[in-house]
Amino acid sequence: MKLPCAALGLFAIGCGVDAPAPCDRTVPGNVCTIAGNGENGYSGEEGLALEARLSLPMDTKVAPDGSLMIIDWNNHRIRQLAADGTIHFIIGNGEIGGSIDDPATGDFNHPTGILFNPAGTQLYISAWHNSKVRAYDLATAAVVDTCGDGRRAYFGDDSPALTASLDLPASIAWSPTGELTILDQANQVIRQIDTAGKIHRLAGQCVVDMAAPSGPGACPDGVAPTACPAPSGKTVCGDPAIWCSTACSPGYGGDEGPALAMRMGQAFGQAADPGGRILYDPQGNLIFADTTNDVIRSIDPAGIVHRIAGVAPVNGVAQGGYSGDGGAALSAQLNHPVDLALGDDGTIYVSDVYNHCIRAIHPDRTISTVAGVCGMKGSSGDGGPATKALLNRPYGVEWNAGTLYIADTGNSVVRAIRLK
């Protein structure tokens, strides 16, 4: 059955999409739709997940009980795919919510990341457009704010996390020592909440140095940016009275140097789409998608930054595209990488969003495609090899127990591949 075209914001959705058909998920390498009927919208609670409507699913997370949590992004909800194939509402009122001064409630404005606490009793949520991180208690259904005052700004480093300001927190991860790490997307930094509840800048810089008319331009050679008034962590190349209220500028720099001195590139502003995700590997390296720079980078336990995939920007221009499968990941081109997942063997899976495919950075640092046909957008391939299927802006990817889960965002479905 073909479904009608529709458009919403940054995404073209539901355009001539084939409704998903049942397929055998046990066949290694085959791709199967497991949630969503391919039609953008909201429906299906307590029914079969394959008959439900989703709206731009952004990511997934396997719960301690084995069910799959789904970020139903444009429905502002978290939903649960149960083992029997049914779908259930977990949290989110389905409307944009959570004003600055409201108490913590079940309102979410485009959540982008979910994470269980180590005990498996709470679900932490990156409430992206709320500019907060919230926690949902699975036993009591209580919601509490854990970071962010709801103001889209950059304030509060080295202060209590609840009084700090974030700007589009895109992703969260637990450090090996129990700190909550946040990719603060529009602030172009990675921040961390220590076990005492204070927030600190871990990597990146919030510098205002965009070219006119949006910014003052780069600082002259040898001139350091000027700090904005405390408690802001922002610096500017120009008059602080004019530019301290301006958004932080994307940039690129700092490879093989200290993380606090590096620059990254993430989308910002009201029209931004969700950007870089983060994860830790067992060795304690923090891996992140430097999305608008079209590279994947890591920060080692000593705090040094390394580029691990993608061609670095040249003279400030990102080198996005598609190339390099079968060769070195550092020589390959990516196009708007967003999400990351870590396989049991150390393979890093990357949602190469604008290439409409999922790439794999192998332990020997070569790269390949594991799902989708890079450079081709569509919706097809259920029941066949994942590398021949067509995806549409897949923003989310997760690995769990030999299965790769894909949030096939533009098709408003979740798909799965049994790889091992």
Residue ranges and their predicted role:
Residues 67, 86, 121-122, 179, ...:
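Generic structural signal for coil-to-beta-strand starts
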Residues 70-73, 125-128, 182-185, 280-281, ...:
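Conserved beta-strand positions in repeat-built beta-propeller and related beta-rich domains
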